[in-house]
């Protein structure tokens, strides 16, 4: 999944080229082979007046010799025994031993040259599994939520642990701020300050509501005396309040995270970093990532004389940008055209607020049952469709469903769930989609944000704000202020790239998402938990309600949170959350139809 936004009305080639390591070309196929030096990568300054994003490679936790590892892996394919990385390093990095005959010295030199060339040959020929053995663990800091959403988490091949806006108060001491001319910079900074003011004010307004909610669920805790008990309740309530208040925070809010990728993914980052949405920031961060790896292994981008033919894409070369035929045409898109698209999309959702099931195989239950019977060599006479589905989905018959690990990916019987596909049409907030991206088996085709920008605020209203008139007034005023600032920047000719940083977390994103029963199964279980953020919980409810309607047998088994699944399988403890227990024994007398009404916070 590639998420993009287009550049500004004016010619943006200069600032983008400043961050592109090869001359831009009319097409990626025509791009000349360019040898990139570490000096080039390090030469590009930060595009921000705020503290620059930082990138640290954890060397002890990462692969130290990605080049040699790829060569050893390739040699292993044709060797009589596994090749050793240390043997590759001796051949490539160390001088020839003393006393070699001229013939042996020449043979060694030839083998060394072939090894150096093999890395580039593997890349060019598409034998890319050899590049996936190398793993790099990065610590990223001061990276915007926009860059993380639009690039670093917009694909399935990563792992991240990111600071939570739900559970960590946002101080606002550092907010990502581009180097804009005046008066645009003042408009931008004022909008940031207004969003932070709204965030703090909403946290304050919502706190009494959540105090009452918390006391309703945990009356003993609310009545407990002492400093420790009071702090426990205050901390829990504050987290709930700031979880909702964060919807007014802009995408300029920075984050720190652990981000782990393999060598192949990092090379893809390097080629595609100029994609729209946040190309300047992403290019800066990716350059730092590659710089860190090159300091560890100078051959990561190819050996001397045999560089990888990366053909890095310029800002206008991305497939999505070309599909729009002309960036200027898209950027001249009228407000009426944007409104027509959004209204049509929203109308198609019909009765559903967040998610509509638009495609599934009507024969899905029978097909999955046939797959189950095929795995174990049974006939329909020996095992009915309902029994076959229960063998996989019923916790009483499948002990894997009570295991702490999600074992379906490695279970032959549970892999039969792959044969039941779904596609949903979704309209959710950016805050929810940032959570949604973590479910990397349910892939979406995310929007070009610039093509979806509307003049009037296009946001969701969180449930806790909708129920409190004072909070709703503050929310609306904050959203209006930052939305007007976004419009003002665009009216002044500021690149949409920078205006996007002012979008609030509550901005709507519209897209299609697909997966299989296997990939949705764990997502639905986790997101139907009362500890899940409210909005993604409500989306999961809509997903499951529609699946239950089209697949009644499957639906009866995928309709509950972890505690329900574990109670059906006999696993203990029934709630796996420990001190994070929601306080409501959902599994008792469970009925999907009553799940939403039983949730308090």
Where are these regions (language model features)?
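A conserved ligand/cofactor-binding region detector
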Residues: 2-601
């Amino acid at each position: 999944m590639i998420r993009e936004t287009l550049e500004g009305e004016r010619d943006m080639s200069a600032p983008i080229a400043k961050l592109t390591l090869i001359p831009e070309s009319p097409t990626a196929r025509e791009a000349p082979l360019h040898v990139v030096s570490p000096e080039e990568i390090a030469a590009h300054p930060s595009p921000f007046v705020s503290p620059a994003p930082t990138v640290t490679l954890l060397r002890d936790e990462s692969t130290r010799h990605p080049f040699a590892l790829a060569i050893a892996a390739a040699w292993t394919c044709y060797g009589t025994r596994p090749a050793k990385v240390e043997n590759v390093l001796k051949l490539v990095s160390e001088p020839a031993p003393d006393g070699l005959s001229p013939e042996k010295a020449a043979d060694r030199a030839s083998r060394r040259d072939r090894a150096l060339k093999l890395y580039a040959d593997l890349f060019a020929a598409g034998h890319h599994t050899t590049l996936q053995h190398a793993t790099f663990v990065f610590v990223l800091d001061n990276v915007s939520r926009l860059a993380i959403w639009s690039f670093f988490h917009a694909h399935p091949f990563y792992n991240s642990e990111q600071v939570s806006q739900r559970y960590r108060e946002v101080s606002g001491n550092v907010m990502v701020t581009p180097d804009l001319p005046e008066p645009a910079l003042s408009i931008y900074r004022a909008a940031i300050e207004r969003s932070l003011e709204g965030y703090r004010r909403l946290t304050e307004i919502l706190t009494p509501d959540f105090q009452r909610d918390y006391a309703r669920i945990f009356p003993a805790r609310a009545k407990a005396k002492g400093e420790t008990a009071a702090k426990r309740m205050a901390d829990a309530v504050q987290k709930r309040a700031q979880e909702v208040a964060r919807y007014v925070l802009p995408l300029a809010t920075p984050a720190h995270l652990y981000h782990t990728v393999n060598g192949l993914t990092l090379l893809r980052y390097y080629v595609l970093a100029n994609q729209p949405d946040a190309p300047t920031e992403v290019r800066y961060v990716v350059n730092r990532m590659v710089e860190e790896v090159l300091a560890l292994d100078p051959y990561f981008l190819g050996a001397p004389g045999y560089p990888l033919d990366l053909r890095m894409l310029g800002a206008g070369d991305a497939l999505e940008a070309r599909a729009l035929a002309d960036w200027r045409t898209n950027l001249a898109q009228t407000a009426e055209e944007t409104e027509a698209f959004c209204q049509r999309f929203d109308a198609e959702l019909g009765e559903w607020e967040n998610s509509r099931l638009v495609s599934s195989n009507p024969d899905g239950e029978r097909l999955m049952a046939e797959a189950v019977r095929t795995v174990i060599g049974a006939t329909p006479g020996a095992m009915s469709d309902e029994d076959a589905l229960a063998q996989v989905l019923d916790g009483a018959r499948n002990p894997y469903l009570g295991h702490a690990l999600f074992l379906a990916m490695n279970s032959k019987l549970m892999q039969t769930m792959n044969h039941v596909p779904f596609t949903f049409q979704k309209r959710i907030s950016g805050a929810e989609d940032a959570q949604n991206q973590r479910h990397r088996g349910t892939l979406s085709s995310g929007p070009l944000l610039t093509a979806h920008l509307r003049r009037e605020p296009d946001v969701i209203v969180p449930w806790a704000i909708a129920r409190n008139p004072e909070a709703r007034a503050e929310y609306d005023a904050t959203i209006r202020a930052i939305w007007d600032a976004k419009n003002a920047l665009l009216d002044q000719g500021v690149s949409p790239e920078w205006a996007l940083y002012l979008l609030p977390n509550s901005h709507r994103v519209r897209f299609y998402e697909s997966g299989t029963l296997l990939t949705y199964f764990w997502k639905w279980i986790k997101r139907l938990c009362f500890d899940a953020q409210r909005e993604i919980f409500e989306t999961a409810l809509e997903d499951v309600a529609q699946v239950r309607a089209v697949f009644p047998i499957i639906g009866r088994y995928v309709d509950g949170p972890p505690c329900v699944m574990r109670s059906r399988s006999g696993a203990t403890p029934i709630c796996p959350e420990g001190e994070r227990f929601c306080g409501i024994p959902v599994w008792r007398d469970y009925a999907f139809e009553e799940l939403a009404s039983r949730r308090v916070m």
